[in-house]
Amino acid sequence: MTAEENAKNIAENEARILELEAVVLGNKSRAFDHRSLIEENRMMLLSNYTAAFAGNRQLANMNTYAIFSNRIAFLRTLSPENDVQTNFVNSQINKARLDALVHRAALNSKVIEISARMAEINAQLIDVNRAIMQANEEIVAFNGAQLAANSAMIAGEHSMAEATVSANAVVISTNAEIIADLGSTASENSAKLEEHLTKTLENRESISQNKAEISERRTKIIANRAIIASNRAKIARG
């Protein structure tokens, strides 16, 4: 191996490095764009959750209470003329109370089930946070090692005066191997980013559809509330 051959190989490596920089740094930009989309989706999901649970759910539950309150109030306005009619009124009141309790118990089961799923999701988010922390630690460790390398170089270790053709050839060959591995990693990352971006955009569409459905349901809930109020007024008038 000669100095001229080393120079040729260095030039080839440099050309590949320039290509890899474009891909790797492009992937970095796309990865952070993708992360931004994911964060936006998460905020939209939380907004939908609040609108559905704290908003629509509570309004619908208020309607349920008012519906059964109206039914029981109406039954109590009746004037039974005999024991059979009295039993009818009382049994219907009990039935209304039971219908409400059965409905509430079923909802409680769903709340418990959904809460369990949310707890699992939180556990996954904790794992994600740990992964981010670990990646940060790796960056800090890498920076520490590179700072040590800079300090050693500044202190005169691995000086240019000690360079040899064979030692340079080893570094050049190692660089070529790293370039090959890095090219594979960059290509895999590009493919993964494309796949994940597609899924993220699909999620965005689903979230938007859910938002529209939540809005439509609230309109129905409010319409039901008007009917409930009308029924209440009729019962009050007798």
Predicted feature residues:
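Extended amphipathic alpha-helical heptad-repeat regions
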Residues: 1-238
